[in-house]
């Protein structure tokens, strides 16, 4: 509530503690942090790693994220997506103009013109790849706190345009 009125001498009602996190969804690495006491701390994985590599592999045995996915960069690069943040908010035609060599094949048949990377799991949009990374960070935070996240702030680079920010 914006304004709470109470009787003089009465204790204010105890506010419910909510669990919020900050997420840096990076091009190369990502991480999640929260306030612990009066200090902001990054939340490590079960292996003690603060950083999660922003790599997703779509394999026969499921989806792998981070270090597990990195091992497939050479073995299966057509199904291992790295630096997906560069593709967020871009149209299929904009990606063709990049000039970068990308090992992926793109699905140009989507009705909205958005790009999708063709993987063995089907056509995957960049936002879906980002969601896989965010899902791992969310689980990491919820395992840390033993409760569900009530809110999150996700960073975006200053140079992102509106389309990229919305995705």
Positions of predicted regions on the chain:
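N-terminal phosphate-binding loop and flanking beta/alpha elements of the actin-like ATPase fold
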Residues: 1-53, 58-167
